[in-house]
């Protein structure tokens, strides 16, 4: 930084600031109007016109707060802060006043809410019940999650098949099902139709003799991948299909059926 911008300021460390010379400003906000004690008033038309609250009085002075109160008035137990003390509103009865000043009775719902707020244990003991299935929950969040299930079920659309009576929750599932009726994949060699393209490809290999899926354990090859997976089970050590007559085990159910149909082991 250039030296022309530097300002040298002498500070006297021995001189301490006198905080008693500073004025203290205490702002007191109260919903009550002390008519016998004249004070500056901040006009607030929206409050004064309603008639529900008295004008807001403001003290700005360096004297202590207790010295400002009129005779016969003492500070009430309110909310303490650095700005002063705010007196609480008077206790309310079972009736309330509207903006016109007339009394209107409190509804049953408001009275029930006030009684619950005064007793925290009443909220915990209350059961939240679903108005659709009468199922109860101990918390409101649990009831809200349960009602979401009702909303999802009601908003869920069902798509019906025009060829049969089946219904699906998604349009994509319905389109896949309709292909089983229309069979759009047709073999050009024999005219056989299929619902899926990969089924047609596996069928065409039966005409061409192509067997691209070979077994890594033996020299057998297959035209379809699913046939290879079934063949690999014969090389597995796990053989969970057992013959009831000779207790011989097999890795595939189809091999067990062939064994039973051959009649090699007849029960005596």
Curated annotation (Swiss-Prot):
InterPro entries: Snail/Krueppel_Znf, Znf_C2H2_sf, Znf_C2H2_type. Transmembrane segments: none annotated. GO terms for cellular component: chromatin; cytosol; nucleoplasm; nucleus. A zinc finger (C2H2-type) spans 128-150, 159-181, 185-207, 213-235, 241-264. Signal peptide: none annotated. Keywords: Cytoplasm, Deafness, Developmental protein, DNA-binding, Metal-binding, Nucleus, Repeat, Repressor, Transcription, Transcription regulation, Ubl conjugation, Waardenburg syndrome, Zinc, Zinc-finger. Phosphorylated by GSK3B. Once phosphorylated, it becomes a target for ubiquitination. GO terms for molecular function: chromatin binding; DNA-binding transcription factor activity, RNA polymerase II-specific; DNA-binding transcription repressor activity, RNA polymerase II-specific; E-box binding; RNA polymerase II cis-regulatory region sequence-specific DNA binding; RNA polymerase II transcription regulatory region sequence-specific DNA binding; sequence-specific DNA binding; sequence-specific double-stranded DNA binding. Changing residue 100 to A: Increases protein stability and half-life, nuclear accumulation and repressor activity on E-cadherin/CDH1 promoter. The keyword Acetylation does not apply. Changing residue 225 to E: Abolishes binding to KPNA2, KPNB1 and IPO7 and impairs binding to TMPO1. Expressed in most adult human tissues, including spleen, thymus, prostate, testis, ovary, small intestine, colon, heart, brain, placenta, lung, liver, skeletal muscle, kidney and pancreas. Not detected in peripheral blood leukocyte. Expressed in the dermis and in all layers of the epidermis, with high levels of expression in the basal layers (at protein level). Expressed in osteoblasts (at protein level). Expressed in mesenchymal stem cells (at protein level). Expressed in breast tumor cells (at protein level). It is found in: Nucleus; Cytoplasm. Changing residue 166 to E: Abolishes binding to KPNA2, KPNB1 and IPO7 and impairs binding to TMPO1. Residues 1-20 are annotated as: SNAG domain. Repression activity depends on the C-terminal DNA-binding zinc fingers and on the N-terminal repression domain. Interacts (via SNAG domain) with LIMD1 (via LIM domains), WTIP (via LIM domains) and AJUBA (via LIM domains). Interacts (via zinc fingers) with KPNA2, KPNB1, and TNPO1. May interact (via zinc fingers) with IPO7. It is linked to Waardenburg syndrome 2D: WS2 is a genetically heterogeneous, autosomal dominant disorder characterized by sensorineural deafness, pigmentary disturbances, and absence of dystopia canthorum. The frequency of deafness is higher in WS2 than in WS1. Belongs to the snail C2H2-type zinc-finger protein family. This is Zinc finger protein SNAI2.
